[in-house]
Amino acid sequence: MNNQASRLDNLMNIKNPKSFFDNKGNTKFIAITSGKGGVGKSNISANLAYSLYKKGYKVGVFDADIGLANLDVIFGVKTHKNILHALKGEAKLQEIICEIEPGLCLIPGDSGEEILKYISGAEALDQFVDEEGVLSSLDYIVVDTGAGIGATTQAFLNASDCVVIVTTPDPSAITDAYACIKINSKNKDELFLIANMVAQPKEGRATYERLFKVAKNNIASLELHYLGAIENSSLLKRYVRERKILRKIAPNDLFSQSIDQIAGLLVSKLETGALEIPKEGLKSFFKRLLKYLG
């Protein structure tokens, strides 16, 4: 445990040459979601977080896919305790954080739904968020939410600063993505879209334009931004089986290049003030989450 704490101290003391401000209390929360499962959402979350880390940012990944948390498997790490242990008071937040790289860490989720009881408990939540200083130097936290439009998933999305919806060209995925866009437009003026598993870039653009047209006809105030397409990669399935991050192992693969472009577009939106994001930290995020779960 002491070794883990020491590694975490090193993680938090890393100087970020690409940040020109004191980011304490200014962590930005990027939620990744989808209208249905099986569209590659969690792999995108993990690879996007790694790409942001490679750009020089300090990044956390929060596995908020309640009931199906599996980012530890995707990253190829073993976690003995997760956020449920922290919320129950059985471990400190510092003890559950798993370092992936110096500057990239995982906040592991729980694969059951017991976590909801503790997130909704004010006393447990207050004790948990009082330890937020351990993550206060992170520039970004990527929140991998569940698929669909369930109440718990929506609470995480509403509490985040930026919502990215992942879809594929499959008709059922597009239909579910629109449902996701529609419900999230009630709380977000701007949403972002990634077209995954496309045969070629123009298929991704066509998927976006189809969704954009329907959304604009029914949700006049919505801004739906296209982050880009990710083509099918012959290497992805291999490295998923091997529990390795493709962006790390094969940075020149088309998948990795697309992830880097998407990360760059997101950063340009979030760092130039195109999106109005208040200064906040993990405590603010969880307090908003509690409000939406209420």
Swiss-Prot record:
Record CDD domains: FlhG-like
Residues at which ATP binds: 35-42
Keywords: ATP-binding, Bacterial flagellum biogenesis, Nucleotide-binding
GO biological process, one term: bacterial-type flagellum organization
A GO molecular function held by the record: ATP binding
InterPro entries reported in the protein's UniProt record: FlhG, MinD_FleN, P-loop_NTPase, ParA/MinD_ATPase, YlxH/NBP35
Highest taxon listed in the record's lineage: Bacteria
Phenotype of the disrupted gene, per the record: Non-motile, has no flagella, and has reduced expression of FlaA.
Single GO cellular component term: cytoplasmic side of plasma membrane
Classification via SUPFAM superfamilies: P-loop containing nucleoside triphosphate hydrolases (SSF52540)
Function noted in UniProt: Involved in the placement and assembly of flagella.
Family (UniProt): Belongs to the ParA family.
Entry protein name: Flagellum site-determining protein YlxH
Native source species: Helicobacter pylori (strain ATCC 700392 / 26695) (Campylobacter pylori)
